[in-house]
């Protein structure tokens, strides 16, 4: 039996959103690697760079709204401010976590976002996962852990920063989906509303956060044409990365975004080996293979869960609430009464 045309178009759109996210995310990592590494341009101001990203995204959103390419719906300012604060805490905490912890523990903290997102979705939205989904998530976590985790050293400050980063990032990603549903706004509409707030706050606070991280102010950096080109390229890719993130979470869920998002980790490791002569060991290859298998199983498990939900939906439609039964009874009694009255008036 062939799928309806609408389902085919939806599937193509889903694949397109994921492809945009993977390509733009991997591209921005490669651009930032060249921009920020000591062998590149040595631009060590990650938080301020993120401010540039959101400023560029906000500019694109303003142009889109001004030209009528996208509509603007109302979202309360306090919701936008709350979301932006959580998102900015996530960015700053991630940078501090990377500075204070070993690379191995930093990777473990990033992997822990998957179960944390699952738990938060269960607490906030009463979302439950079948055993197949839970098993596939574990396979992905194990696979990515094998290929990325090396030395693991923990300290108190680093642990607190890592916990803050994991919680705030997980909450931010869940909020993207819930805000879109709550106010019936599209992914780009929501992004165009939050980007200006994040841009202003990050451009004001970013240089001070970067000073704490690197001991240098951005004003001391000697700009070159090469660095400016990499910054502009990074900003352009950030627009697509941000849009596709909101698209993917809006279409799927924060959990799916986290699980399938680790395809980016696999791509980054592979491109690092091809373009930057990074070491590729058997451990890396085995871990990537396990992670990919886990992602395939996850996709299958989610599809199985959807089919189960679809089968249970028709039965639910036939069941009526007490209020519906009461209204139906009242309607029948009213009809019977009218028939009796009409019958009495007949000769």
From Swiss-Prot:
Q: Which effects follow disruption of this gene?
A: No visible phenotype. Slight reduction of galactose content in the cell wall composition.
User: What is the annotated localization of this protein?
Assistant: Golgi apparatus membrane
Q: Any stretches that span the bilayer, and where are they? A: 11-31, 43-63, 80-100, 103-123, 132-152, 159-179, 195-215, 223-243, 256-276, 285-305
What tissue specificity is annotated for this entry? Widely expressed in the whole plant.
Q: Which UniProt keywords apply?
A: Antiport, Golgi apparatus, Membrane, Sugar transport, Transmembrane, Transmembrane helix, Transport
Give this protein's Gene Ontology molecular function annotations. antiporter activity; GDP-fucose transmembrane transporter activity; transmembrane transporter activity; UDP-galactose transmembrane transporter activity; UDP-glucose transmembrane transporter activity
User: One biological process GO term for this chain?
Assistant: UDP-glucose transmembrane transport
**Would you tell me the Gene Ontology cellular component terms?**
Golgi apparatus; Golgi membrane
Per the record, membrane topology reads:
Multi-pass membrane protein
Q: Tell me which InterPro entries the record gives.
A: Sugar_P_trans_dom, TPT_transporter
Tell me, what does this protein do in biology?
Nucleotide-sugar transporter that transports UDP-rhamnose or UDP-galactose and UMP in a strict counter-exchange mode.
PANTHER family in the cross-refs: SOLUTE CARRIER FAMILY 35 (PTHR11132)
Family of this protein: Belongs to the TPT transporter family. TPT (TC 2.A.7.9) subfamily.
Q: What is this protein called?
A: UDP-rhamnose/UDP-galactose transporter 1
The record lists the organism as Arabidopsis thaliana
């Amino acid at each position: 039996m062939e799928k309806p045309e609408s389902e085919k178009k939806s599937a193509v759109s889903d694949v397109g959103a994921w492809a945009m996210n993977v390509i733009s995310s991997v591209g921005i990592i490669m651009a930032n690697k060249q921009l920020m590494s000591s062998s590149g341009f040595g631009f060590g101001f990650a938080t301020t760079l993120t401010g540039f990203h959101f400023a560029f995204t906000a500019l694109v959103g303003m142009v889109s709204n001004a030209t009528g390419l996208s509509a603007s719906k109302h979202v309360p300012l306090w919701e936008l401010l709350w979301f932006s604060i959580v998102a900015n805490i996530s960015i700053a905490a991630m940078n501090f976590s990377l500075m204070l912890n070993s690379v191995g523990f930093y990777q473990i903290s990033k992997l822990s976002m998957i179960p944390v997102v699952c738990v938060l979705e269960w607490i906030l939205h009463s979302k439950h996962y079948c055993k197949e989904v839970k098993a596939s998530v574990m396979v992905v976590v194990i696979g990515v852990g094998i290929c990325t985790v090396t030395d693991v050293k923990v300290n108190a400050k680093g642990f607190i920063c890592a916990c803050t980063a994991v919680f705030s990032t997980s909450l931010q990603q869940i909020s993207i989906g819930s805000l879109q549903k709550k106010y019936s706004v599209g992914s780009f509409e929501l992004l165009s509303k939050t980007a200006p707030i994040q841009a202003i706050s990050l451009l004001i606070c970013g240089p001070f956060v970067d000073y704490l991280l690197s001991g240098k102010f951005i004003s001391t950096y000697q700009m070159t044409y090469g660095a400016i080109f990499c910054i502009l390229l990074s900003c352009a890719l950030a627009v697509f990365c941000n849009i596709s993130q909101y698209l993917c979470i809006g279409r799927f869920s924060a959990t799916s975004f986290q699980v399938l998002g680790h395809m980016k980790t696999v791509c980054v490791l592979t491109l690092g080996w091809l373009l930057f002569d990074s070491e590729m060991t058997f451990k890396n290859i085995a871990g990537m293979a396990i992670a990919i298998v886990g992602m395939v199983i996850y996709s299958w498990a989610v599809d199985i869960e959807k089919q189960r939900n679809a089968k249970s939906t028709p039965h639910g439609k036939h069941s009526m609430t007490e209020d519906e039964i009461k209204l139906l009874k009242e309607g029948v009694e009213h009809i019977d009464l009218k028939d009796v009255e009409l019958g009495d008036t007949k000769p």
